[in-house]
């Protein structure tokens, strides 16, 4: 773990600022492991600051010193902020160059990730912010690279025991239909049949 990431990790703002002012690279990837060396995790300081226990000041400081909000060598900062539904951090990242439609290392976008997590309210909000619900990707879940928001909506419907009366879910389905998506959504149905 880099000194910079460690300073962020320990919530030491003064040291974070000192290191950046003295040449620390905000885009240096740290590789570390929790329990065994076989389970490594890559992390960038900007990603860490997007988790819920950090104020905006850390993120602002890193971006002021050249942190790249679209660096895919670790989890994208947008994904970390979305995990905690931190709309303020998401908006700030977008204002400072984050690409809302950037694929991560497994070819998912933040809106695909939130659809997978069934966070329908955040999916709608991200769509309003410019996320493309039909951008298709995904390589990590046996989906054949067919993942998009419609795919995960159909998956939710196929599951058979969700809250289909959720107002945000209903809005999302209606909005997808308004752009020409038909349910049942064929790519998700095809994949279900292939896996049976």
Specify the residue positions occupied by each region the protein language model found.
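Ankyrin-repeat boundary/"N-cap" motif
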Residues: 1-6, 29-49, 71-80, 103-112, ...
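Ankyrin-repeat intra-repeat helix-capping/turn positions
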Residues: 11, 53-54, 85, 118
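Ankyrin repeat domain, specifically the short helix-to-loop turn at the C-terminus of the second helix
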Residues: 17-25, 60-68, 91-99, 124-132, ...
């Amino acid at each position: 773990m880099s000194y910079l990431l460690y300073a962020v990790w320990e919530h030491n703002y003064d040291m974070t600022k000192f290191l950046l002012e003295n040449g620390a690279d905000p885009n240096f990837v740290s590789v570390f492991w929790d329990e065994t060396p076989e389970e490594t995790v890559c992390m960038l300081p900007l990603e860490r600051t997007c988790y819920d226990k950090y104020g905006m000041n850390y993120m602002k400081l890193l971006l002021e010193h050249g942190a790249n909000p679209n660096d895919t060598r670790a989890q994208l900062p947008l994904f970390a902020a979305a995990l905690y539904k931190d709309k303020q951090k998401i908006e700030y990242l977008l204002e400072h160059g984050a690409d809302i439609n950037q694929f991560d290392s497994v070819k998912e976008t933040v809106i695909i990730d939130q659809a997978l997590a069934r966070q329908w309210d955040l999916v709608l909000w991200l769509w309003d912010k410019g996320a493309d619900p039909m951008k298709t990707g995904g390589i990590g879940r046996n989906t054949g690279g067919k993942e998009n928001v419609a795919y995960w909506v159909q998956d939710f419907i196929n599951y058979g025991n969700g809250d289909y009366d959720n107002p945000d879910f209903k809005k999302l389905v209606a909005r997808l239909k308004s752009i020409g998506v038909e349910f049942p959504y064929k790519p998700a149905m095809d994949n279900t049949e292939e896996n049976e």
